[in-house]
Amino acid sequence: MTITPQHLIALLPLLIVGLTVVVVMLSIAWRRNHFLNATLSVIGLNAALVSLWFVGQAGAMDVTPLMRVDGFAMLYTGLVLLASLATCTFAYPWLEGYNDNQEEFYLLVLIASLGGILLANANHLAALFLGIELISLPLFGLIGYAFRQKRSLEASIKYTILSAAASSFLLFGMALVYAQSGNLSFEALGKSLGDGMLHEPLLLAGFGLMIVGLGFKLSLAPFHLWTPDVYQGAPAPVSTFLATASKIAIFGVVMRLFLYAPVGDSEAVRVVLGIIAFASIIFGNLMALSQTNIKRLLGYSSISHLGYLLVALIALQSGEMSMEAVGVYLAGYLFSSLGAFGVVSLMSSPFRGPDADSLYSYRGLFWHRPVLAAVMTVMMLSLAGIPMTLGFIGKFYVLAVGVQASLWWLVAAVVVGSAIGLYYYLRVAVSLYLHAPQQPGRDAPTNWQYSAGGIVVLISALLVLVLGVWPQPLISLVQLAMPLM
């Protein structure tokens, strides 16, 4: 096909981030300067965000058979770019105390965000696999960035080996799907499934293997075993990216796949996904109860959040409300996670060995950093789904979708999981207001609110509260971001 100027406009975010990768690479080769490379990365990501307006003006279109640029792709591209931007701003003060090479961090984040944008636009199983690999490979380096820390290196090796195994499952599943249907395009797969091919054993085996591969990337039970160790071992800014950008991008492409190729019409697939969702919600919340490490706690909580989202995915065939539910929930999850991990990043900056991830480090935080403690409280309440926060709106949507689709056992799991989650989120919030220990451990800088990371954390808290009280702007945005059918 011929690439026209319209196609280039549609690909602007991808092209801008790709160009930023090249510029940062050349800048590192020319002269190592931490501030310069961080600034170039942030400018590139901001330019990519601004370019989404021009993409919207160009309208929805297919750019090559691999990619479809529409409102849905723009929404998920925007969320990935916001997460990448936050990761870079949290990383800057953390890297200030890091004695080894600092600049490559931004390069790896940019390449991973490139993979996230590709996933948001993917309309083909080949693009899906390329995007997942492009987002996973830089994460191997990012997770082990503090390689002199034994735990960071261990987390990187663990993620690398398990990720390679998951990718092989995904690829083998795609091969079986192609062998049976002769197609890799989402829409062509949809036509094949419509012709009565959905119940073919080879096709179901292929989709089963793909669910294993994607379940690992989304850290769904029982493919979640890497999650707490990797969240704990990775530097705090990397855990931010891992919890937000990679999960959002992969879940977005899975939504598009299930929408165009209605795999969920198969009772066998629905039952398997239902069991995975149920296990993720209950197991994630139960395991988080006993955690004293805040990054491990957030790791287990992310398993349960992906379980809640899976309920909306299973209900996808029951109406457009499922699409809305996922969009609103992911936005709430993004801002809540950015705030929570942002506070951990600020407390851990500059780099001085292990992060401030023990719950004891946050005991009595209110008495010397009251605003930071208030931000952390808001994030915990939002993740718990308390009314007047954005997390409540997302959870309400998921429950409404579950009821609409008559998924009563999953609705019960969401209610029970939320009740369990309330305990451990409030445990973190309450510890912030207890008496401070005689010898406080790590602490955020006194002027944290004037740093770029501090501003991101404050904006996240503000959005969680404002959109929790008045969610209509977000709901309208998500309704506009419907995929081109």
From Swiss-Prot:
Subunit structure: NDH-1 is composed of 13 different subunits. Subunits NuoA, H, J, K, L, M, N constitute the membrane sector of the complex.
GO molecular function, one term: NADH:ubiquinone reductase (non-electrogenic) activity
Transmembrane segments: 8-28, 35-55, 71-91, 105-125, 127-147, 159-179, 203-223, 235-255, 271-291, 297-317, 326-346, 373-393, 408-430, 455-475
Family annotation (InterPro entries): NADH-Q_OxRdtase_suN/2 (IPR010096), ND/Mrp_TM (IPR001750)
Claim: Transmembrane helix is one of the keywords in the record: yes
Membrane topology: Multi-pass membrane protein
Record EC number: 7.1.1.-
GO biological process terms on file: ATP synthesis coupled electron transport
Domain of life: Bacteria
Keyword ATP-binding included in the entry's annotation: no
Family named by the database record: Belongs to the complex I subunit 2 family.
A GO term from the CC aspect: plasma membrane
Subcellular compartments: Cell inner membrane
Protein name per Swiss-Prot or TrEMBL: NADH-quinone oxidoreductase subunit N
Record Pfam families: Proton_antipo_M
Protein task: NDH-1 shuttles electrons from NADH, via FMN and iron-sulfur (Fe-S) centers, to quinones in the respiratory chain. The immediate electron acceptor for the enzyme in this species is believed to be ubiquinone. Couples the redox reaction to proton translocation (for every two electrons transferred, four hydrogen ions are translocated across the cytoplasmic membrane), and thus conserves the redox energy in a proton gradient.
Primary location recorded for the protein, binned into one broad class: membrane
Keywords associated with the record: Cell inner membrane, Cell membrane, Membrane, NAD, Quinone, Translocase, Transmembrane, Transmembrane helix, Transport, Ubiquinone
Catalytic activity: a quinone + NADH + 5 H(+)(in) = a quinol + NAD(+) + 4 H(+)(out)
